[in-house]
Amino acid sequence: YVNLGQYQEAAADFEMGLRIDPKNWDCWYHLGLSYHLMGSYERALKAYETCYALSPTDEYRICTTDWYCMTLMKMGRIDDMRKAASRIHADMEPGMSEGYFDRVLVYNGTRNIDEVLAEAAAKDDHMYATGAYGLAVYEEYVLGNREKAKEILTRIAGRDETWGGFAEHA
């Protein structure tokens, strides 16, 4: 349902899955995503907090922290976002969460936003969207630069080879 844009139905499915297996990391992560995409940010935060606690490796902690931070940004809770981002550090192993990793390192001040955007631009469309979307959120909600955020989002939309990722939905 998430990929169809039916976020309420997706949340209902993930909630049902959690009744069956309350420690299912994937259900918690995608429940948080569903709530985030519906604009139910408080509920998204709670799902991501549980998801983070269940995260078995850096790879899982990184992607969970990224969506948690974006949720906090959209809520205007910038100090809380910086605190959450600080738990991710450059010597972690990102695995498949590389795009999330680089942007969380921007959120916590370890990496430069322009460098990360340039690196993301060299990747395929899906990985560009993954790397750039959170930086657009950061530009708008943290730096107050709505025009630059809009430029990033326009570039994401203009790279139309793949459209299956969560950044494209957000």
Spans of features found by a protein language model:
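Register position in tetratricopeptide repeats
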Residues: N3, L37, K74, Y141-V142
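Structural marker of alpha-solenoid helical repeat scaffolds
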Residues: I20, L54-T57, R159
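Residue-level recognition of tetratricopeptide repeat
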Residues: L33, M70-L72, V137-Y138
